[in-house]
């Protein structure tokens, strides 16, 4: 017990006498936290990466050395109402030389926000979470996350105020997270892309895509996308049944898409330059049917039906 922290539980240390010469890597802790409130300011005496003036309320069974331990059946709530339930392995919290930080978490539930996560580990999480996540608000996450100072592997299901997201992504070069490399699958369900991207003419989307590229902001985005767009709200119309295979490097989109929407049946292959007020297009398209009035491209429904190349 300290002036700011209190722990009720059992602590056992397992070691041979010679292990004390390499205490952080050899002495095994077996700690049962039955009830504990631990101040981040106290933790910073041992590992100076926690945000200041936070308090963690913890129930877990911790086993391992200081440089390789696992919190089994962890239940953690902090004073900012972040909640973590799951099992997490930490390595090299006290590493030296080539011993770099590593975390592998299997989360039954993680409830927090971009701002609140930054307050837990400002330098580790603050640098490794894309700034766009701030627009999601409070999120609930289930799944697995592997995190180092160089890469993140995330196989998660996420619910936020913008909608639902499933991802199985590998991200590298996360030193500059907004321009990180990524590859994997991304599924959005009724997700408000317009708010995330800051585009008023874009609304909610339901998509199932393979992605391979870099960048999480409009300026840095450069990615290949391939898959199905089941629903996409644009310019006042909900598009359906679209297949895409192309790349986006702002301000250019280059590639193919096929639309089997009831009001837009077409094949498109080409380039769109979105950098100018008067958009530039260079493409080939076979349009079997397009109702430009329903799609909100013309205001006079008497000339709205278009077919051709």
Specify the residue positions occupied by each region the protein language model found.
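Interface amphipathic segments
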Residues: 1-309
């Amino acid at each position: 017990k300290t002036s700011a922290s209190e722990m009720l539980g059992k602590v056992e240390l397992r070691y041979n006498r010679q292990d004390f010469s390499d205490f952080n890597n050899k002495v095994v802790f077996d700690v049962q936290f039955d009830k504990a409130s631990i101040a981040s300011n106290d933790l910073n005496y041992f590992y100076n990466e926690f945000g200041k003036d936070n308090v963690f309320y913890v129930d877990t069974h911790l086993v391992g050395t200081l440089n390789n331990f696992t919190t089994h059946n962890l239940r953690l709530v902090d004073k900012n109402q972040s909640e973590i339930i799951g099992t997490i392995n930490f390595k090299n919290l006290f590493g030296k030389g080539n011993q770099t930080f590593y975390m592998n978490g299997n989360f039954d539930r993680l409830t927090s926000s971009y701002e609140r996560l930054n307050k837990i580990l400002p330098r580790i999480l603050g640098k490794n979470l894309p700034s766009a996540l701030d627009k999601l608000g409070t999120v609930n996450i289930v799944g697995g996350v592997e995190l180092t100072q160089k890469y993140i592997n995330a196989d998660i299901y996420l619910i936020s105020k913008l909608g639902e997201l499933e991802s199985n992504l590998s991200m590298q070069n996360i030193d500059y997270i907004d321009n990180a490399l990524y590859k994997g699958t991304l599924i959005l369900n009724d997700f408000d892309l317009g708010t995330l991207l800051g585009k008023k003419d874009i609304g909610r989307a339901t998509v199932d895509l393979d992605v391979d590229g870099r960048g999480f902001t409009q300026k840095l985005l450069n990615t290949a996308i391939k898959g199905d767009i089941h629903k996409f709200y644009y310019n006042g119309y909900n598009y359906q049944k679209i297949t895409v295979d192309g790349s986006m490097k702002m301000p250019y989109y280059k590639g193919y898409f096929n639309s089997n929407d009831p009001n837009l049946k077409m094949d498109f292959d080409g380039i769109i330059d979105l950098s100018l007020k008067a958009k530039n297009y260079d493409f080939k398209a076979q349009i079997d049917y397009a109702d430009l009035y329903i799609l909100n491209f013309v205001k006079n429904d008497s000339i709205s039906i278009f077919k051709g190349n």
